[in-house]
Amino acid sequence: MKIGIIGAMEEEVTLLRDKIDNRQTITLGGCEIYTGQLNGTEVALLKSGIGKVAAALGATLLLGHCKPDVIINTGSAGGLASTLKVGDIVVSDEARYHDADVTAFGYEYGQLPGCPAGFKADDKLIAAAESCIRELNLNAVRGLIVSGDAFINGSVGLAKIRHNFPDAVAVEMEATAIAHVCHNFNVPFVVVRAISDVADQQSHLSFDEFLAVAAKQSTLMVETLVQKLAHG
């Protein structure tokens, strides 16, 4: 099995990259892909860049060039669920765009023409992630993750997301674009991210402060998940 892993930022991939043996670097379209073995398992780790376009471009390049069997999207996220705090884990059962609106033509809010309203994560990957969470004794929430090209740092943006997606557990800027690409290529995916901030008017301050905490927690989760997927 070859496992594809996608993170947006240097801070979100550096700990995993440093653990890859026999590492080779491929630079394509402004993205970097690091291939090799993570604890004996073949992996391809993509640093995509921030935002939906960068994530979709990177995911497409990763799938075409490295042909992974599954995709794990990792990194940081803003917490929406009331039980989440910095360092906790969110696992997707679905991903949706929070900044797409074609409702004038009868689509659901967040749905693009020709696409489902939401992109469902793979049940087996979700189950494996939840098993890792139990083994590591981490606090985690499973649910809807929403994505858009905005860092949510104010009451207006937050209220809009809560109104349109009351069940959303976390918000970030890449996961749904990656899920969209995986859907088109029929490749199983799951989003496993750590909370770096709680989406509110001070989220930019806590993001800067706690990104390293989120990166450490998400790396631990992904490393454990890769082992479980490879060896059961």
Curated annotation (Swiss-Prot):
Residues forming the catalytic site: E12 (proton acceptor), D197 (proton donor)
Q: Which pathway does the protein contribute to?
A: Amino-acid biosynthesis; L-methionine biosynthesis via salvage pathway; S-methyl-5-thio-alpha-D-ribose 1-phosphate from S-methyl-5'-thioadenosine (hydrolase route): step 1/2
Q: Which UniProt keywords apply?
A: Amino-acid biosynthesis, Hydrolase, Methionine biosynthesis
**GO CC field:** cytosol
Q: Which residues form a coiled coil?
A: none
> Could you state a single Gene Ontology molecular function term?
adenosylhomocysteine nucleosidase activity
Enzyme Commission code: 3.2.2.9
Query: Which top class of enzyme applies to this chain?
Result: hydrolase
Locate the residues binding substrate.
G78, I152, M173, E174
Reaction catalysed?
S-adenosyl-L-homocysteine + H2O = S-(5-deoxy-D-ribos-5-yl)-L-homocysteine + adenine; S-methyl-5'-thioadenosine + H2O = 5-(methylsulfanyl)-D-ribose + adenine; 5'-deoxyadenosine + H2O = 5-deoxy-D-ribose + adenine
- List the InterPro entries: MTA_SAH_Nsdase, Nucleoside_phosphorylase_d, Nucleoside_phosphorylase_sf
For the biological process aspect of GO, one term held by this record is: L-methionine salvage from methylthioadenosine
Question: What Pfam families does this protein map onto?
Answer: PNP_UDP_1
Q: Per the record's keyword annotation, is Amino-acid biosynthesis included, yes or no?
A: yes
* UniProt record similarity statement: Belongs to the PNP/UDP phosphorylase family. MtnN subfamily.
User: Main role?
Assistant: Catalyzes the irreversible cleavage of the glycosidic bond in both 5'-methylthioadenosine (MTA) and S-adenosylhomocysteine (SAH/AdoHcy) to adenine and the corresponding thioribose, 5'-methylthioribose and S-ribosylhomocysteine, respectively. Also cleaves 5'-deoxyadenosine, a toxic by-product of radical S-adenosylmethionine (SAM) enzymes, into 5-deoxyribose and adenine. Thus, is required for in vivo function of the radical SAM enzymes biotin synthase and lipoic acid synthase, that are inhibited by 5'-deoxyadenosine accumulation.
Q: By its UniProt entry, which HAMAP family does this protein fall under?
A: Salvage_MtnN
The record ties this protein, via PANTHER family, to:
5'-METHYLTHIOADENOSINE/S-ADENOSYLHOMOCYSTEINE NUCLEOSIDASE (PTHR46832), 5'-METHYLTHIOADENOSINE_S-ADENOSYLHOMOCYSTEINE NUCLEOSIDASE (PTHR46832:SF1)
What does the subunit comment say? Answer: Homodimer.
Q: What is this protein called?
A: 5'-methylthioadenosine/S-adenosylhomocysteine nucleosidase
Gene source species: Salmonella paratyphi A (strain ATCC 9150 / SARB42)
Gene behind the chain: mtnN
